Amino acid sequence: MIRFFFFSLLMFSTNLSFAQVDSLILKNGNIIVGEFKDMDKGVLTIETDYSDSDFKIEWEGIKEIYSKTKFLITLSSGTRYNGPLKSSTTGSVIIDDYTTGEEEVNLNEIVFLKSVDDGFKSRLYANIDLGFSITKANNLRQVSMRSKIGYLAERWQADASYNNLYSTQDETDAIRRIDGGLSYKYYLPKDWYVPVDLTFLSNTEQLIDLRLNAKLGMGKYFIHTNNAYWGFAVGASYVNENFSGDASDKNSLEGYFGSELNLYDIGDLSILTKAVAYPSITESGRWRADFVFDTKYDLPLDLYLKLGFTLNYDNQPVEGATDSDYVFSTGLGWAW
């Protein structure tokens, strides 16, 4: 009774400063009132009126949660909802979906929350990180940038990315590598999804002026929890390649299969690895592969440190080019 009275009083007292009051009760009995921004990778972000910085709360430490905010909600099963949520008297969570009505789920089934309204801005997200290195030997200078912006809807997600690396040193040609693209995912029941990608690569090391790659496939998340996710995708791609020098341009069809693993239940550190293989359909014996390994350490104020490794391999490169190229980068970034 005392806790209920205190809880009600706290919600009333903060109502003057928040257009929408959300609240939760932790397993240790503490009560936090504020505005839920999102929950991703097992961490809930809360904006409060009594702190200059947002609170980060481990999802597994929450006992009860109450909110009338409109959320995009994803369960570990891949089921998606759109609406507010509140804890029930039985210890589960009731989601009031705007389409299907009330659904009762376990709290630990929820793996993603994002507070949204009917505006475009609330569904956007972005990040950018920059790196710069100087080495006295050979007067090496290297500048790198990695960036991404995306939009999340109820049943689909779209992203655009752009990455650039430029390196110079004495007695050798400058090295430039630019890559990026557009990607789209349509989410199906039970954590299946349809990926559509259009990517580009320009790489002086492999004598690639421009490689365009259009992909269509089918994927599934086999693990999707507050500790990690692991997915696999297969499909087909069309490749158009323009090379430096006298090498002829190429157009080819490829199959592809790839996997992605993200681990994030390790404090402020997260690890992301992706591997994709492209066996050619129209060029006998040719196959390509892309590999990405990123580690990210979260800092205050939405800043982060990132350490990344990227590898591109082609077993049939054009004459005069190497069969592989890799990038090792470090940078300071900001996420929004």
Regions found by a protein language model. Give the residues of each.
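Compositionally biased alpha-helical segments
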Residues: 19-163, 179
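Membrane-embedded beta-strand positions in outer-membrane beta-barrel channels/transporters
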Residues: 127-129, 144-146, 177-181, 193, ...
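Transmembrane beta-strands of outer-membrane beta-barrel pores
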Residues: 132-136, 153, 164-168, 200-204, ...
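Structural signature of outer-membrane beta-barrel channels/translocons
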Residues: 150-154, 185-187, 219-223, 260-264, ...
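Repeated loop/turn-to-beta-strand initiation elements of outer-membrane beta-barrel proteins
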Residues: 154-160, 191-194, 226-230, 262-271, ...
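Outer-membrane beta-barrel "beta-signal"
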Residues: 324-336
